[in-house]
Swiss-Prot record:
Remarks, miscellaneous: Heme 1 (or BL or b562) is low-potential and absorbs at about 562 nm, and heme 2 (or BH or b566) is high-potential and absorbs at about 566 nm.
Alphabetical UniProt keywords: Electron transport, Heme, Iron, Membrane, Metal-binding, Mitochondrion, Mitochondrion inner membrane, Respiratory chain, Transmembrane, Transmembrane helix, Transport, Ubiquinone
Domain of life according to the entry: Eukaryota
Free-text comment on the cofactor: Binds 2 heme b groups non-covalently.
Entry annotated with the keyword Transmembrane helix: yes
Ligand binding (a ubiquinone): 201
Transmembrane regions: 33-53, 77-98, 113-133, 178-198, 226-246, 288-308, 320-340, 347-367
Pfam (any one): Cytochrom_B_C
Protein name as annotated: Cytochrome b
Single GO cellular component term: respiratory chain complex III
Originating gene: MT-CYB
Organism: Sylvilagus audubonii (Desert cottontail rabbit)
Molecular function GO terms recorded: metal ion binding; ubiquinol-cytochrome-c reductase activity
Subcellular location, principal: mitochondrion
Amino acid sequence: MTNIRKTHPLLKIINHSLIDLPTPSNISAWWNFGSLLGLCLIIQILTGLFLAMHYTSDTLTAFSSVTHICRDVNYGWLIRYLHANGASMFFICLYMHVGRGIYYGSYTYLETWNIGIILLFAVMATAFMGYVLPWGQMSFWGATVITNLLSAIPYIGTALVEWIWGGFSVDKATLTRFFAFHFILPFIIAALVMVHLLFLHETGSNNPSGIPSDSDKIPFHPYYTIKDALGFLVLILLLLLLVLFSPDLLGDPDNYTPANPLNTPPHIKPEWYFLFAYAILRSIPNKLGGVLALVMSILVLAIIPLLHTSKQRSMMFRPISQVLFWVLVADLLTLTWIGGQPVEHPFITIGQVASILYFSIILILMPLASLIENKILKW
């Protein structure tokens, strides 16, 4: 008799996705981040659900409701910090997942890659709106500054910003709608993840060599289920270390001060995972130019497949591209550091140089390096 997992309509889908899935035998730990992102999403949805049971999205009570969660709700402090630091782990995994995709040429799976970019935008939007909800100083001023950027759009900008705010400033209406969107978006993300996986399973996974692996596939279970389980343990360990020993390490002390529209904090900055984009935004003195650069810093990912000039898919055997890739990583770390610094000399210049370098590497230097490597192949 055939196993039920191969015949049952629902179990059959799970079987083809997680059990009998033919997987390349040589995929490294860099391929663990997909499942880790799935785990992060589950953690965020569950902790978020329990937080939403106690949170109130009203300007008068939002801050005190978060305080109430931390002080009076059973293990509320744990749920709150798991959620806040879970977002940080989410972005660490996201950036590593995208970096893996660039390094090993996974972007040649166009549908999977493009849905991944949409997912990245959706997760960033969710995280931004979530940061507004505790209604601390950085919540309020972060929301004011970032939403205000839309006013740079010609003709419709001001009307658009006031429409998003639901008034003439960030206020009760803004907080309520941000809570509504913050609640619904993770479920939209979960649906997009399914589509992301659907397209991935149409082609099968890439592998470090970038060479088709049809001749050497192994079943996902038990080989990669056990490998993913190890990744889960490492992620949970790191998250718990962060939550239980220094829960506020990645947060901003200003967010422990209730929102006050009459008092601007000296340095308005977003959470650490947005600092690289914030640095790119600030490096351009023009408002509209800065907004375009900010959007392009992520949208540039969509252009990468069009600029693939190499005869090899992966960077595994391409030393010049490898050097450029790691320079890009160092550049992103530099931008992250600059984003958290005040707007003064020498940080302004460093930020501008790092921003130019970021776009230059992706749009000019990497395609050129690939062409040079193609020539070297013929020697």
